Amino acid sequence: FIGAILPAIAGLVHGLINR
């Protein structure tokens, strides 16, 4: 479960940082 949402959160955070 966590292994499925982890990449989603990582991608979201990366998108916010690499604005």
Curated annotation (Swiss-Prot):
Chief place where the protein resides: secreted
A biological process from GO: hemolysis in another organism
Modified residues (Arginine amide): R19
One cellular component term from this protein's GO annotations in UniProt: extracellular region
Lineage: superkingdom: Eukaryota
UniProt entry tagged with the keyword Secreted: yes
Record's keyword terms, sorted: Amidation, Amphibian defense peptide, Cytolysis, Hemolysis, Secreted
Subcellular location per the Swiss-Prot or TrEMBL entry: Secreted
Tissue: Expressed by the skin glands.
Function: Has hemolytic activity against human erythrocytes. May have antimicrobial activity.
Name this protein carries in UniProt: Hylin-b1
Protein species of origin: Boana lundii (Brazilian tree frog)
